[in-house]
Amino acid sequence: MDLQDVQNKEIMLANGWQMDISSNIPFWIQKITDRYCNSNTFYGFKAGPRVGKVMATFQGYGSATLDFGNCATQGYTSVFLNNKYIAHAGPNTSSKSISFQYNPGSTLLFNEFCSGIIKINSLKLDCICKYYFTYIYQIHSFRSPQYIL
């Protein structure tokens, strides 16, 4: 599971993301949206007055850097970590970068309001687990097996 791969909806869903966005977008709207939103990475919205949502749940400990935006000419994209607001992007905001810490079970939620379009440019994760376990192994490797975690 790689939450960092935000190329498109299908890949993200396969990697554990959850989404409540419109799927059957008319071709002509899709063409216009592709031009404004850059189809190289994920973008999505809920057609009509309902709020579009995209969510991921983290499995480990670490820090993350998120680059996101709102590629619509109106509305907002808001970001929440564990249901607490951490950032938003207004109209025509192609890129905004934020950093945060996460733990197992932490949730990252995107909402689009007032006809905004959620744009996820990148999500870079730095999991501290591998460093922690390497350290534990190194400090215990000189001891007898009964002391190894």
Model-derived regions, located:
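Extended extracellular/luminal ectodomain segments enriched in beta-structured repeat modules
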Residues: F58-T65, G105
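Short beta-strands within extracellular/lumenal beta-sheet-rich domains
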Residues: N38-Q59, Q74, S94-I98, I118
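Short, surface-exposed beta-strand/strand-loop-strand elements in extracellular ectodomains
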Residues: Q74-Y85
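Extracellular beta-strand elements of beta-rich domains used
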Residues: I120-L123, I128
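Extracellular glycan-recognition surfaces and repeat-rich motifs
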Residues: N8-T41
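Short, intrinsically disordered C-terminal tails of secreted or membrane-associated proteins
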Residues: S144-I148
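Short, surface-exposed tryptophan/glycine-enriched loops
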Residues: S95-T107
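Short beta-strand-plus-loop segments that form exposed binding edges in beta-rich domains
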Residues: F110-I117
